[in-house]
């Protein structure tokens, strides 16, 4: 039996805020962005999982840490809508968000909030079984803690599936054999 493609890693909420600039702020010489629209999408490992699911990879499962906040709930909805089955590890603190303020197609400012690197909770037995039955595994590390989780690393070292590792400078080295 062919198992799913399993993506493992840190997921962030990417938000693009589009607007128009018609004036400068009166108390400092910076543009004032009047928001017209915004769009949310998963970033990090979530983006890799969405790409795989929407490009015909078959069944795609994402093992990631999600905070119990509005950002985590939004990510869960976006991922499910894209056909990604989410296996969430508990994440203490807030969801990492990357907010880009844009006008006329150009980024004026990126505002990062939440999501300091934290150790996620332990994976369930279902997650460990998922990794064991995977047809392939992609680790998409964003340096925020999921790729450092000891039980996940042990499951990755034990799987017979091919494992690809997209490293991050702040993340750990790939498990031996990858």
Regions found by a protein language model. Give the residues of each.
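Divalent-cation-assisted or electrostatically stabilized phosphate/pyrophosphate-binding catalytic cores
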Residues: 29-36
């Amino acid at each position: 039996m062919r198992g799913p493609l399993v993506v493992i890693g840190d997921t962030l909420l990417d938000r693009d805020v589009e607007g128009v600039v018609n004036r400068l702020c009166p108390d400092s010489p910076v543009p004032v962005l009047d928001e017209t629209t915004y769009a949310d999408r998963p970033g990090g490992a979530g983006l890799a999982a969405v790409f795989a699911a929407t490009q015909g990879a078959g069944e795609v499962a994402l093992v990631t840490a999600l905070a119990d906040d509005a950002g985590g709930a939004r990510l869960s909805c976006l991922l499910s809508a894209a056909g990604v089955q989410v296996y969430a590890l508990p994440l203490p603190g807030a969801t990492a968000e990357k907010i880009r303020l844009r006008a006329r197609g150009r980024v004026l400012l990126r505002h990062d909030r939440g999501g300091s690197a934290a150790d996620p909770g332990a994976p369930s037995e279902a997650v460990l079984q998922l990794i064991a039955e995977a047809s392939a595994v992609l680790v998409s590390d964003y340096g925020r803690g999921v790729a450092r989780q000891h039980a996940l690393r042990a499951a990755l070292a034990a799987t017979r599936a091919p494992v690809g590792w997209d490293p991050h400078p702040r993340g750990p080295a790939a498990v031996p054999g990858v």
